[in-house]
């Protein structure tokens, strides 16, 4: 019996979530909520979504047993949910596809998005091209520089990419600019938020579209292993890949571990470990944990991974932390790079730097467990986009 039923009708996960936006957006969000409530239980909408996930995105993604790496580490077996094998190379397309289908049904001709690592931008540009929609992507200028390949992909796909020069010039600033655009152009524009943050109904909607990850995993684990894993491990920036894996498992007793970016260490001010070091506040339309100073001002974050470099986190993760249902830990840049190289070496898989944080935690946990234990890691994306960053960190030029 399903007992977990959050958010409530106002978008709250306990004290988190909700709607904290300018008056000009209230009616747009209410319309979005009504339309989403209508279509989330609409058989035709769900059938089209399932069809697109299968025939365009390439789902289901397999679960792969990383045997050589598991043997090298000793202890538990590491299994990978291969979201890197989706069209466009990450989990982001699951949500972008769902929201694009909703936008079409709402009669919107233009989509906008924010992006950090560029994967959500690429996914949004991809579905916009698929459906013939105008597309504008907001991206912090720092991220434009470190994710140049993804910027070019977006442009190839027909999107206009607008570099954001304000603030720390990263994901939170891109989100601010996208919100401003939406306020101005709400009549014809649909804002495809890329993570489980923002005002209600976005955290719920993005979670629901990403929950295909966990639903597939439940079926695949039963078919391939005759049981479910002992722990689920996923990286957390905003937290959409993690909640996509966790949500279908929430009523079980399976251990859930979210892995944040500890950057140069949580004892420094150069990290993005929101749940580890932050405290509650309001940002981007919802109440959640934030990295802020004593005056409540958002502090600049750091991670080698552009997709984890965010000072907030999805409100559902804030609730899962407080309730004790999920645990959250930090992994440093250095530890993530080590896991990145290990997966390349032992398994012939180049992971995204975001996913490498989850892999690094699995590598720490596995040796402490017996060999009959199964750790399911969400390999949220592939690492092609991170080649320049990894090369720089390794003092290699090409």
Swiss-Prot record:
Q: Look up keyword Transferase and say if it applies.
A: no
Enzyme superclass (EC): lyase
Identify the cofactor(s): pyridoxal 5'-phosphate
Q: Annotated pathway, please?
A: Amino-acid biosynthesis; L-tryptophan biosynthesis; L-tryptophan from chorismate: step 5/5
Q: Which domain of life is it from?
A: Bacteria
Instruction: Kindly give the Gene3D superfamilies that the UniProt entry links to this protein.
Output: 3.40.50.1100
Self-association and partners: Tetramer of two alpha and two beta chains.
Protein known as: Tryptophan synthase beta chain
Q: Which organism is it from?
A: Nitrosospira multiformis (strain ATCC 25196 / NCIMB 11849 / C 71)
Q: Upper lineage ranks? A: Bacteria, Pseudomonadati, Pseudomonadota, Betaproteobacteria, Nitrosomonadales
């Amino acid at each position: 019996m399903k007992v977990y039923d959050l958010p409530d009708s106002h978008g709250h996960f306990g004290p988190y979530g909700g709607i904290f936006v300018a008056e000009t957006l209230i009616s747009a969000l209410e319309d979005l909520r009504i339309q989403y409530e209508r279509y989330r239980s609409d058989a035709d909408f769900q059938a089209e979504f399932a069809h697109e996930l299968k025939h365009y995105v390439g789902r289901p993604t397999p679960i792969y047993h990383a045997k050589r790496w598991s043997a090298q580490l000793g202890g538990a077996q590491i299994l990978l949910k291969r979201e890197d094998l989706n069209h466009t190379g990450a989990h982001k397309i699951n949500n972008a596809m769902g929201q694009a289908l909703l936008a079409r049904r709402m009669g919107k001709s233009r989509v906008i998005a924010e992006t950090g690592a560029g994967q959500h931008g690429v996914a949004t540009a991809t579905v916009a091209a698929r459906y013939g929609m105008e597309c504008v992507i907001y991206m912090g200028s720092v991220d434009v520089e470190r994710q140049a390949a993804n910027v070019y992909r977006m442009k190839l796909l027909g999107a206009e990419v607008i570099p954001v020069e304000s603030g720390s010039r990263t994901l939170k600033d891109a989100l601010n600019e996208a919100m401003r655009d939406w306020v101005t152009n709400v009549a014809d524009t649909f804002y495809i938020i890329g993570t489980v943050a923002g005002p209600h109904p976005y955290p719920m909607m993005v979670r629901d579209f990403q929950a295909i990850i966990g639903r597939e995993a439940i079926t695949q684990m039963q078919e391939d292993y005759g049981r479910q894993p002992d722990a689920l491990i996923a990286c957390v920036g905003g937290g959409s890949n993690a909640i996509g894996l966790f949500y279908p498992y929430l009523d079980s007793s399976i251990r859930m571990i979210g892995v944040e970016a500890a950057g140069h260490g949580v004892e420094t001010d150069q990290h993005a470990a929101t749940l580890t070091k932050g405290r509650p506040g309001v940002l981007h339309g919802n109440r959640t944990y934030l990295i802020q100073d004593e005056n409540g001002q958002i502090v600049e974050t750091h991670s080698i991974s552009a997709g984890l470099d965010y000072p907030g986190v999805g409100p559902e993760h804030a609730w899962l932390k407080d309730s004790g249902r999920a645990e959250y830990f930090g992994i440093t840049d250095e530890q993530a790079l080590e896991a990145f190289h290990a997966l390349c070496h032992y398994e012939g898989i180049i992971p995204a730097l975001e996913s490498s944080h989850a892999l690094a935690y699995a590598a720490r946990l596995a040796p402490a467990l017996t060999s009959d234990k199964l750790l399911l890691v969400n390999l949220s994306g592939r690492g092609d986009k991170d080649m320049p960053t990894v090369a720089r960190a390794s003092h290699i030029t090409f």
